[in-house]
């Protein structure tokens, strides 16, 4: 690492991903289960509300990215606004509604606020990292620091509620979670403010005219539509178990006390194996390595489908294996997308490419949340209650079998893309990913 990219600057930039990821876990995993269990929110209603909220969250990403480009000179102010919006929404969710008669409206409003703030911060943090340095090796280093801090944030968020609930009530534990978030975000906003005040981005987005062009739909439906389709199917496969992991652990495995341990194993595995996937990609290239990770995920889902009720040891192994696959899913889609942007000389609309990639997991969450909760409600499943063997079997099918099928489809599409595009593109993507290709 040279003097142009020092550790203090990497920490000031990357640390912000820690409180951001910390907030993301309760938003996308804990809160739906909390409101179903503690406030009696009907699963069909919850599924419908989540479907609408996730769609709003997904659709607004390209708009927020476009607006952030137009006010790029006010990036610090944008970060302040995003932080305040996220904090307000998360506080409302963690402290709960003033009365149960407004639970649906309270949950909906707070989720919209929180997810909007989360999107603003995520888009701008990724933009800053992507355009901080021109050098590809530097960009990979920057992304690695950001993702490492993010995984630490996820790990802390997984542990805090479980530890807090050993001494506090469920609601009090989430109040404690918000307090921890406030401390971490306070540190994060100070560091990122200092970073923005002392750091000049080396890479320009393009001319004002290029920035004003709204190319989101043409990006998704253009030459790279097969790549985006692979990502979308893969994200749905990952979203379903992420949404159902809490009821699965509590109502199928009957091991609610071990939830924090399971989540910790998952995120630790993701962090540990990220370096492993990076090394493998040096030999195989990013596409082939991602395909191998697909196979790991498929085998993991097969194993999860065979779990018996109360099989905590087997599920711990599933958590480690699925976390291993998580590292690849975090690493390779952005790396492959960078290769596409560079190959097609589309740097001027790079922000919108990343907005498109950010849109897909949120759209996947919308479909997964709406579909799974509505299906569970159809069979009479009740979160945190005594459910029949049939209802638990449906939960198992949704948690393991459906994602296994989807991941198999995603792997098939990726295999088709590799054969269709040929090994020339694979070599190009490997070179761009590792920073060995330079513009002539």
Describe each PLM feature range.
Residues 2-435:
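Membrane-embedded alpha-helical bundles of multi-pass transporters/translocases
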């Amino acid at each position: 690492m040279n003097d142009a990219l020092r550790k203090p600057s990497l920490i000031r930039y990357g640390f912000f991903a820690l409180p951001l990821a910390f907030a993301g876990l309760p938003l996308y995993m804990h809160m739906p289960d909390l409101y179903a269990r503690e406030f009696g929110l009907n699963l069909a209603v919850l599924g419908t509300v989540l479907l609408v909220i996730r769609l709003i969250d997904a659709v607004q990403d390209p708009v927020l990215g476009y607006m952030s480009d137009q006010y790029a000179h006010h990036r610090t102010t944008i970060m302040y606004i995003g932080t305040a919006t996220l904090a307000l929404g998360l506080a409302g969710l963690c402290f709960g509604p003033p009365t149960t008669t407004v639970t649906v409206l309270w949950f909906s409003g707070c989720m919209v606020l929180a997810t909007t703030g989360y999107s603003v911060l995520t888009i701008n943090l990724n933009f800053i990292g992507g355009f901080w340095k021109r050098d590809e090796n530097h960009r990979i280093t920057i992304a690695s620091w950001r993702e490492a801090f993010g995984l630490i944030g996820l790990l802390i968020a997984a542990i805090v509620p479980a530890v807090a609930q050993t001494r506090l009530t469920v609601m009090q534990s989430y109040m404690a979670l918000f307090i921890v978030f406030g401390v971490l975000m306070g540190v994060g906003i100070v560091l990122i403010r200092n970073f923005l005040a002392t750091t000049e981005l080396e890479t320009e987005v393009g001319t004002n005219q290029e920035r004003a062009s709204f190319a989101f739909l043409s990006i998704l439906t253009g030459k790279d539509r097969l790549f985006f389709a692979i990502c979308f199917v893969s994200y749905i496969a990952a979203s379903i178990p992420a949404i159902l992991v809490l009821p699965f652990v509590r109502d199928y495995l009957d091991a609610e006390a071990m939830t924090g341990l399971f989540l910790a194993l998952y995120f630790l595995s993701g962090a540990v194996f990220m370096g492993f996937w990076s090394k493998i990609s040096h030999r195989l290239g990013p596409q082939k390595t991602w395909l191998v990770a697909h196979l790991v995920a498929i085998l993991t889902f097969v194993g999860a489908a065979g779990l018996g009720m109360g099989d905590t040891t087997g599920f711990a192994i599933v958590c480690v294996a699925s976390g291993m696959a998580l590292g690849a899913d975090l690493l390779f889609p952005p790396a492959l997308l960078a290769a596409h942007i560079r190959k097609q000389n589309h740097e001027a609309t790079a922000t919108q490419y990343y907005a498109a990639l950010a849109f897909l997991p949120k759209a996947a969450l919308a479909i997964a949340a709406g579909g799974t909760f509505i299906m569970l409600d159809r069979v009479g499943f009740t979160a945190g209650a005594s459910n029949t063997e049939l209802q638990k079997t449906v939960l198992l099918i949704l948690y393991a079998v459906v994602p296994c099928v989807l991941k198999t489809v995603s792997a098939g599409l990726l295999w088709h893309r590799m054969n269709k595009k040929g090994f020339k593109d694979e070599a190009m993507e490997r070179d761009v990913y590792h920073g060995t290709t330079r513009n002539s």
